[in-house]
From Swiss-Prot:
Encoding gene per record: DIO1
Family of this protein: Belongs to the iodothyronine deiodinase family.
UniProt organism field: Suncus murinus
Active-site residues (renumbered): U126
Parts of the chain on the Cytoplasmic side: 34-257
Extracellular side: 1-12
Stated name of the protein: Type I iodothyronine deiodinase
PROSITE patterns (UniProt xref): T4_DEIODINASE
Top-rank EC class of the record's enzyme: oxidoreductase
GO function term, MF aspect, one: thyroxine 5'-deiodinase activity
Ranges that cross the membrane: 13-33
Subunit architecture: Predominantly monomer. Can form homodimers but homodimerization is not essential for enzyme activity.
């Protein structure tokens, strides 16, 4: 059950005030004392992986922080996380998705017996998602014999008409399902090694899994085996590697009937 209407509204208001204060203070510092806030932003970029991404310089992304577009996106992510009800060990939400062919499906359709299913939520405009995509592909290569993988393309993290970075992939907000499918097809050029589906335009999967801007999950037999933290700070394919490796060891040690 979700929060009662009034309780949720109060929590949303609290988040609104907190984010607004953060943006206001950050904007003042960035405008009046840019050299003072630079070390803080650079430290943050180390955690998100932006500092290691050769595609971007500090000037490509730092000036966009604390902008109006930044405010609305951060607020949306925080509001989404308020309603996050997924927990490790709980039943995994069986949300609707769409194949690149346009065929409708549900996440549980991709689960096979007791094989783990790795869910990779993200979008091409999310720098850390693309930067770490090769890590995800290595997961597919290393564990495809024992696990299944699915990339779920969600709404853009840094759309060109939203909170946009310079030198980023130029993709607008998806106005309809066809635009979302078109954006998701760009991932095929990177040879993902697994099926790619898109979230519905109601963003149902993203909401149920609190996946914005990117997130990793491992499901098994209908339950959440691993729940990664929200990206970009906590998007760690290496954690999924450790989970799958442990499963392989446990399976090898299990007595055979």
């Amino acid at each position: 059950m979700g929060l009662p209407g009034l309780g949720l509204l109060l929590k949303r208001f609290g988040v609104l005030v907190r984010v607004a204060l953060k943006v206001a203070v950050g904007k003042v510092l960035l405008t009046l004392w840019p050299s003072a806030i630079r070390p803080h932003l650079l430290a943050m970029s180390e955690k998100t992986g932006m500092a290691k991404n050769p595609r971007f310089t500090y000037e490509d992304w730092a000036p966009t922080f604390f902008s109006t577009q930044y405010f609305w996106f951060v607020l949306k992510v925080n509001w989404q996380q308020l309603e996050d009800r997924t927990k490790q060990g709980d039943i995994a939400p069986d949300s609707p998705v769409v194949h690149l062919s346009g065929q409708r499906a549900r996440l549980w359709d991709f689960m096979q017996g007791n094989r783990p299913l790795v869910l990779n939520f993200g979008s091409c405009s999310u720098p850390s998602f693309l930067f770490k995509f090769d890590q995800f592909k290595r997961l597919v290569e290393d564990f495809s014999s024992v696990a299944d993988f699915l990339t779920v393309y969600i709404e853009e993290a840094h759309a060109s008409d939203g909170w946009a970075f310079k030198n980023n992939v130029d993709i607008r907000r998806h106005r309809d399902l066809q635009e979302r499918l078109q954006a998701a097809r760009l991932l095929l050029d990177r040879n993902p090694g697994c099926p790619v589906v898109v979230d519905t335009m109601e963003n149902r999967s993203s909401q149920l899994y609190a996946a914005l801007p990117e997130r990793l999950y491992v499901l098994q037999e209908g339950r959440i085996l691993y729940k990664g933290g929200p990206g970009p700070w906590n998007y760690h394919p290496e954690e999924v590697h450790a989970v799958l490796e442990q499963l392989c060891r446990s399976s090898a040690q299990s007595p055979r009937l």
